[in-house]
Structures are given as structure tokens and as C-alpha cells.
Amino acid sequence: MPPSPLDDRVVVALSRPVRPQDLNLCLDSSYLGSAAPGSTSHPPVIATTVVSLKAANLTYMPSSSGSARSLNCGCSSASCCTVATYDKDNQAPTQAIAAGTATTAIGSSTTCPASQMVNNSENAGSLSPSGGVGSPMAGTPKQLASIKIIYPNDLAKKMTKCSKSHLPSQGPVIIDCRPFMEYNKSHIQGAVHINCADKISRRRLQQGKITVLDLISCREGKDSFKRIFSKEIIVYDENTNEPSRVVPSQPLHIVLESLKREGKEPLVLKGGLSSFKQNHENLCDNSLQLQECREVGGGASAASSMLPQSIPSTPDIENAELTPILPFLFLGNEQDAQDLETMQRLNIGYVINVTTHLPLYHYEKGLFNYKRLPATDSNKQNLRQYFEEAFEFIEEAHQCGKGLLIHCQAGVSRSATIVIAYLMKHTRMTMTDAYKFVKGKRPIISPNLNFMGQLLEFEEDLNNGVTPRILTPKLMGVETVV
């Protein structure tokens, strides 16, 4: 349907949601006739009109099959039609009908026969979606377009200015897209962590079924993010310099794409955290700051208080030594499990191996009692299923007067989680207290967010009596804490 010469726009209702570039729009020129000499079947062409396609401001509405596009009219109908607006652009009269290609703004092209395409010799009939930036687009673009960057020095100036004015709430919202363990070790002050390391969360974010807000790891970050409409948003990962070269599978790409779909205009920190820390390490934190964390899809409940806020420096995981958590309970890594001399010196007679692949070192010598808990350090691993089995083995070592070494690959996540749970079981420590206690002994610990969620659920069961605590005999070495 061509635009009316009396109107500036034509509104077309479509029966289903479509992308503007999928409409293959071309004006029906059959009524104009041919400009060929001697033709009498149609009147001569006296003018042409070039139209541009604009997507209406659409919003996501729920449906049984996921998110559906619908009008931004406040209705709750998932079947509400999609509206596209065609604005007329009057051009100078011309006598020619040119066959051409209608090229969309994102690079795809559609070729129409000459009899179906009205064109202008100066301007191609471009169908460019130029509506609101929040207009959803089906599919994933190969590259991020028009993403701006911010340099480390500029971000540092903004942060310093807000700090001096004592108005941190007026500063930019900073989003960390790196894995949670890396965020735990070091991050820019005030940055909120986006937990999209697992495939399920990434896919749901790409599909628009969840938003960036849903993946923020702490309540404080969520509250800050809700107030970003008048703020800058700065996103960073470890070392990205060119956002346009980030591949679609990377968390940075997914977060940026989601933010733009929500109508935001995020900036990317050039060079990421690595570049920022070179000159502004004083504006970075080296600790876990986690309030009411939860794993999306993991069912973790909220934490009751804040975990430790600072440690002297970034822990050296590779050079960490075997750590005595209690007089009889030691937390270590793969190398510690191989150190026969140290284990014998510490009277260790029991070993818990919390991996699926590391061997039971020295098993053939018959010097130790071994237990393997086959677990991976992933967001899907159910580690809680091994808690009671591990507790019984630890108690057996304790009653026999022997030390016990619990280890995984690095003594950071899996084995640390079980030690924290053991302290919660045998004392009145909260999850936060137990975490602080173990972190104070071994600063490198960093249970992944999935395991933190399981510890929170375990704490809830302990408090509700679903899982009983064992408080006698009292553990030695924690009297000043409990």
C-alpha cells in the first residue's frame, strides 16, 4: 500500500511480529505504468516516492513460548499486533523507474524486479530501522555497532570526582563481565558483577527472557542498577580493546547487546581491568563483596549479611601453602596432596579428594585413608549431596586422633566449600562467619556462586532444624569466634 499523498505517514498493522528488514518492502508500481515510448496501457509516471521504514517502540510481552513482541501500549496481550510506521520522504519528480536493491540498515539486501520497485536516481529506497534503540531484533548481529569506549584515565577522573563530592550515587554504573572468581580476586571499586558465565544464563539473556538486572549478583548492585536511567553505564571485562571485534559468545558481547536492547547506551572500558589497574590500582578492590547473592536458576536464597570487604593484597593462588583451618583439619591443593613428608609431619592420616580426575596420591603405600568426592567446579555441580559423607569422614579422623587433608585442584572453591559447611554444622557459625573464618586462614578461597548458594540453603536448613547441628564435643580452635 503506497503512502497517501495527503498524509505524512502510513501505519500498517501486521498480524505477527516481524523484523523491519524481513518485510522486503517495495512499492507496488504496477499502477504507475511503464515509461516506455508508445505504451498506452498505463498513464505515464509523473513522480516517485521513497519511503523509509521505522520500527515502532516495541516491548517484550510474556507468552507460553517465551517473550513475544507487542505494542508499547500497556496491554498485556501477547497476540497484540506489531506496528510499523512508514514515513514519507517527498523527492523531486522524476520520469524514470529504476530497478535496484533495497538495502537494510544492518546490511542485508532484497532485490525486487523493476516492475515492483520505485526508486530515485539520487537516493536508494533504503529500509532503515530507525526507531527507538529499545526495539527488539530477532537474531544476533555478528558485530556490535556504534559501541563507544571510555579510556581508563577518564573513568578514574569520574570516580575521583564523585568521591570528592561525596556523591557516589551520582557516578556511573560499572558492570564487571568477567567470571565470578576473577571478580572476587579484583575488580573496580563499586563495580557490580554480572553472572553470565554459564550457557543457560547467556542463552536466556540473548533470547530476552531475562535482563542484565536479573544477573547482578548482589542486592546493592541491583538497587544501583535500577536507578541507571539518568546515569552512564560502563562495562568491562579483562582486556578488550575493540568492542566491535568481540564475538557473540563472549559475556561482554551478550551484556552489551542486552543493554542496547533495553534502550541503554553503554560504554566499554578500553583495555578492560588489566589496563585500568596499571595506573589506577588504588581504585580497585581485591575482595569479595557479596550481599544477598543468588545463582539464577540455582535456587539460592539470600545471604543475611555482608562478607569480608578487604584483604591486604591479591592472593597468590599458585604459591599458597597447606593451611591448617583447625588443629586436625587442613585445606590444600594438588601439590599438598603429593607432599608425603609434610603430610606425615602434620600427622595427617585421612585425605578427601574433591575432584573427578586427580589421582589418590600415595594410595598404594597404604599410609592414608582416602575418600573421593567426584565433583567439578561448575555452576551445575551439586556439592551439597556430599556434605554429610564428608562430615562423617572428617569426624572419623578427628576421633582417631589423626589429621585430615581436604583438597581439590587449587584449594579455592570445592574443598573450601566443604570446610565452610563443616564449621557451620559443628558450631553456631552463620555462613558469613564460617566464610570469614576460613578466608582469614586461607585468603585465596573463593567458592563459586553456585556453591555459595548451596551454603546459603544449608544454613537455612540448619536454622530451621531440617538438618541438625552437632555441637558436642566442641571444636577446638574456634572458641574465640563462636
Curated annotation (Swiss-Prot):
Any Pfam family hit: DSPc
Main location: cytoplasm
Record-level GO cellular component terms: cytoplasm; cytosol; nucleoplasm
Catalyzed reactions: O-phospho-L-tyrosyl-[protein] + H2O = L-tyrosyl-[protein] + phosphate; O-phospho-L-seryl-[protein] + H2O = L-seryl-[protein] + phosphate; O-phospho-L-threonyl-[protein] + H2O = L-threonyl-[protein] + phosphate
Enzyme class name: hydrolase
Residues annotated as domain Rhodanese: 168-285
Stretches the record annotates as Interaction with MAP kinases: 199-215
Active site: 408
GO BP annotation list: negative regulation of epithelial cell migration; negative regulation of epithelial cell proliferation; negative regulation of epithelium regeneration; negative regulation of ERK1 and ERK2 cascade; negative regulation of JNK cascade; negative regulation of p38MAPK cascade; negative regulation of respiratory burst involved in inflammatory response; negative regulation of stress-activated MAPK cascade
InterPro entries hit by this protein: Dual-sp_phosphatase_cat-dom, MKP, Prot-tyrosine_phosphatase-like, Rhodanese-like_dom, Rhodanese-like_dom_sf, Tyr_Pase_AS, Tyr_Pase_dom, TYR_PHOSPHATASE_DUAL_dom
Gene3D superfamilies per record: Protein tyrosine phosphatase superfamily (3.90.190.10), Rhodanese-like domain (3.40.250.10)
Localization per Swiss-Prot or TrEMBL: Cytoplasm; Nucleus
GO molecular-function terms, A-Z: JUN kinase binding; MAP kinase phosphatase activity; MAP kinase tyrosine phosphatase activity; MAP kinase tyrosine/serine/threonine phosphatase activity; mitogen-activated protein kinase p38 binding; protein serine/threonine phosphatase activity; protein tyrosine/threonine phosphatase activity
The keyword Nucleus appears for this protein: yes
Keywords from the UniProt entry: Cytoplasm, Hydrolase, Nucleus, Protein phosphatase
Domain Tyrosine-protein phosphatase intervals: 321-464
Annotated EC: 3.1.3.16, 3.1.3.48
Family: Belongs to the protein-tyrosine phosphatase family. Non-receptor class dual specificity subfamily.
Subunit structure: Monomer. Interacts with MAPK14.
Function field: Protein phosphatase involved in the inactivation of MAP kinases. Has a specificity for the MAPK11/MAPK12/MAPK13/MAPK14 subfamily. It preferably dephosphorylates p38.
Record-given protein name: Dual specificity protein phosphatase 10
Annotated source species: Bos taurus (Bovine)
Gene symbol of the encoding locus: DUSP10
